[in-house]
């Protein structure tokens, strides 16, 4: 996004997130599982025009999606061959939550932390480095990431904590509602529009 849309702010990123969520909702209504959900398979024309590409890998009925990435795959499915099991809507929602997280903290995977290893090694609930309760931060990445996290709405942080720290399933509508609320707050001037904080 940085090169293609250099003038974008948080409203643009949040609207992209909302349109991806709506796209997933529409497909799920027809029992179509995306399976291989990742940024490379999403084409963004502008914040309101978003397309899913490489749709030949969609899981339809008993035909599994045979490809994927660890980062967008729930931990319980790590080690399995993608073509040997059928994914669920919950698998798509986990991948979607990861994508939305990376839009809110631009480019940063949820389990990335200071001193961490590979993406696959990092993907454990106890490694989620952002503050979810009184326990505080846990080796959060250096730089602006703690600041950005601290300025996200409570509802959205709660959803990320449920998915990445507590390993819980969430409803698609809950993340959609949280993003819609965030857009409203941004448009009303209740939240900063900065994508990244230049100084802490």
Where do the protein language model's features map onto the residues?
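Conserved structural core of kinase catalytic domains
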Residues: 1-15
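Catalytic-loop of the protein kinase fold
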Residues: 24, 28-45
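Activation segment/activation loop of eukaryotic-type protein kinase catalytic domains
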Residues: 40-78
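Conserved end of the kinase activation segment
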Residues: 77-90
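Conserved C-lobe activation region of Hanks-type protein kinase-like domains
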Residues: 100-157
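A conserved short helix/loop substructure at the end of the activation segment
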Residues: 163-174
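Regulatory extensions appended to serine/threonine kinase catalytic cores
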Residues: 177-180, 184-200
């Amino acid at each position: 996004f940085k090169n293609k849309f250099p003038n974008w702010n948080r409203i643009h990123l949040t609207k992209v997130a909302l349109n991806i969520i709506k796209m997933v909702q529409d497909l799920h209504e027809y029992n179509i599982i995306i399976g291989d959900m990742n940024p490379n398979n999403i084409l963004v024309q502008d914040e309101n025009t978003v397309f899913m590409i490489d749709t030949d890998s969609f899981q339809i009925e008993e035909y599994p999606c045979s490809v994927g990435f660890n980062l967008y795959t729930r931990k319980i499915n790590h080690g399995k061959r993608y073509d040997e099991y059928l994914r669920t809507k919950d698998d798509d929602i986990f991948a979607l939550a990861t994508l939305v997280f990376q839009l809110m903290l631009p480019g940063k995977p949820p389990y990335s932390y200071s001193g961490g290893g590979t993406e696959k090694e990092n993907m454990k609930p106890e490694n989620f480095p952002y503050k979810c309760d009184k326990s505080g931060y846990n080796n959060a990445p250096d730089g602006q990431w703690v600041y950005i996290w601290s300025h996200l709405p409570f509802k959205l942080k709660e959803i990320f904590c449920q998915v990445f720290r507590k390993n819980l399933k969430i409803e698609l509508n809950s993340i959609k509602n949280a993003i819609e609320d965030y857009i409203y707050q941004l448009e009303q001037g209740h939240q900063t529009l900065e994508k990244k904080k230049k100084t802490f």
